[in-house]
Amino acid sequence: MASLNLGFSGARKKAAARIRAVERRNLITVCRFSVKTLIDRSCFETIDDTSAEFINFVSILEHILSHRLKGQVSWFGYESPRSFWDFIRMACSKVPHSCIHSIENMENVRSSRAKGRAWIRVALMEKRLSEYISAALRDFKTTRRFYEEGALLLGEEAGLLADTLIGLNAIDFSFCLKGEGLDEDCPVVIDYTPYLKFTQTSDSISSDEEEMRTLGSSGSEAGTPESHMAASLMADQSSWFSKSKRLEQKYRVVLEQRGYLEELVRLREAQLSESVSQNKALLQRLTDTEISHKLEKEQLEIIILELQDQLTVLKNHDLRSRQELTSHLTNQWPSPGALDGNAVALDTLLYRKRTGPWEEKSFPSLEQLSADMSLSQTSLDPVQLNTHSLDSKAGLAHWHREGKEDTPSLRGLCGSLTSMASYKSLASLKSSEYLASPTTDMTSPGLTPS
């Protein structure tokens, strides 16, 4: 039983799919007929709101745009009918220079149905109806959101619809958008009468001609020659009339196809020229970008070279500064010879102070001087510096015990020989007027040691 129900449901689904396919084919076929009728009518008169062909075309287009359109779900879960304007407003909002915003702001058009009808008229006057439909079909996500499965805009017939509407760009429409008649709630009805005309085929025409000839031949046996001639003339006239009708019909079809193809070619040429211009602009932009990148790369390479040169200069400068600092510190430290001379002068002075005041032409012996020199050399030894400092302090204490008066020139001798202040005080001792250098006295030509 379950399998039987599944079979019935599958059959119902297939039947519903076939019905939807038939609906789509019928709608697209009627739309093509309506477009051709509008093109034919536009050759003789201006198309406006009162034209029967235009009213029928608008009804067909509303049926196509409303085919299997989803309803709007309310807060309570009920589904209310929706107008196709909601879909057009969402799907065509990104079309450049669109009329969507101006229709939204129209004061005399308030309902969604009226705005949708106003949009159709404005798009026809702008000759952009096919462009709007194509843009809406490209937004497949929005189309799927607004239409159910099996809708014409979701099928293969949607592309045929956009191509069919291109032919309307050759017509100059003129409408009044005052809102009168746009808010009618009556259901739109498609009039199929103009498309149900009887068209005689070529086979039926030939059979009619054969029948006329047969009737003429049968009547000629019992009739006069005049009646036979009249029958033949009527047959010829009917044949020529039927031929002219066929030629006129073919001419109209070819003319319509030519207009359609010319409009299609113009549209494709416009699209091609636009694509070519966009391609040129992109190529120019790419060239400019490559040039700017190349210039930027060259500038960065120059900056890198300059930074490398500056880094080399800074390294060399740092090396020279280190060398200069090392030589400067080396030069500031006194040489061993200068230290020996200063030590000799200091030891000689201390020896003279211990033995008594200097007398003119009174000098120590050479043995004493050599002993003093050896003493001064040993005083520079870091191990014996402390001992020498203690001897100096003892000598100074001996001067105080003898009641000697301290002079400013002798106060610099109280420190240790290891400090820089003591070395500087030795230089001041040489220029003092109270102390004389023993080396100068010894090398004077007028004095001899006793």
From Swiss-Prot:
Classification via SMART domains: RUN
Family: Belongs to the RUNDC3 family.
Keyword Secreted attached: no
CDD domains recorded: RUN_RUNDC3B
Matching SUPFAM superfamilies: RUN domain-like (SSF140741)
Official protein name in the record: RUN domain-containing protein 3B
Gene that specifies this protein: rundc3b
PANTHER family, alphabetized: RUN DOMAIN-CONTAINING 3 PROTEIN RUNDC3, RUN DOMAIN-CONTAINING PROTEIN 3B
Pfam families the record matches: RUN (PF02759)
